Amino acid sequence: MRFCSHGNFFALPNEIFLLGLTAGELAVYSFLRRCEDRKTRQCWPSIKTIGQAVRMSENTVRKYIRQLEERGLITAEPTEVITKTGEKRNGNLLFTLRPIREVIDEHYASQLAELELATERQRVAKLLRERESPA
């Protein structure tokens, strides 16, 4: 099994732990981070290769890739290859890892919006209670 490699270590941003990722999401993200081209932020390991590296089935890897996409950490685009006989075949997915700062900023903006909505709901509920109760 051949893994992507950039030496004996890779950097994983500390902020990744602020997002509440599951162990599976973190494992898949870490492997993609290990494989990525630092300039383009892209990599294209196969689902099978990812699964072997993180010791998960291919279906489980697909599930975590989908969840990482939903969280906005990565994008996964299908690719095509042309065989020697001229046939078009599906290639590996092309993964693009988004800059962690953008992901964190979006995460905090989402949390703030949820908090503001909850605060507004509480305010409206209080107003309704005050109107309904006799003075």
Please state what every model-predicted region is.
Residues 1-135:
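Electropositive, intrinsically flexible nucleic-acid-contacting patches
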